């Protein structure tokens, strides 16, 4: 999973440099966590979005491990699987304002499309196979 996280961050650094005020990892850790979670969820179908108990940060759950843009989360007990209300809250709180739309798309939709162009099926297969 760390390989995918690093790939997403490096690709975002290249593709989003003119749209973000700083590097993408900082953005995904401080304000863009929902977008990051949606990107990973768009790549790994069996993953689920999680939110911490304080409703201040979200990440992704895959094979009983929780990840964010920094990698594996050190305090997974502080997170829960997001329900429909949590998702609406996260989209409202952590979602991207229109000024950060990229070519008419949310950052997550834009990045998922870019990732698909990169043909990383083997990486995804390896991640899904390793975690099982």
Question: Where are the language model's segments positioned?
Answer:
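A structural boundary/capping signal
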Residues: 1-132
């Amino acid at each position: 999973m760390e390989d995918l996280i690093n790939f997403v961050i490096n690709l975002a650094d290249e593709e989003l440099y003119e749209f973000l005020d700083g590097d993408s990892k900082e953005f995904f850790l401080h304000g863009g966590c929902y977008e990051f979670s949606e990107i990973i969820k768009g790549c790994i179908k069996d993953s689920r979005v999680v939110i911490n108990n304080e409703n201040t940060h979200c990440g992704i759950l895959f094979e009983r491990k929780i990840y964010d843009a920094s990698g594996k989360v050190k305090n997974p007990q502080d997170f829960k699987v997001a329900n429909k209300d949590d998702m609406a809250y996260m989209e409202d709180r952590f979602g991207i304002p229109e000024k950060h739309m990229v070519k008419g798309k949310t950052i997550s939709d834009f990045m998922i499309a870019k990732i698909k162009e990169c043909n990383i099926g083997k990486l995804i297969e390896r991640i899904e196979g390793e975690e099982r």
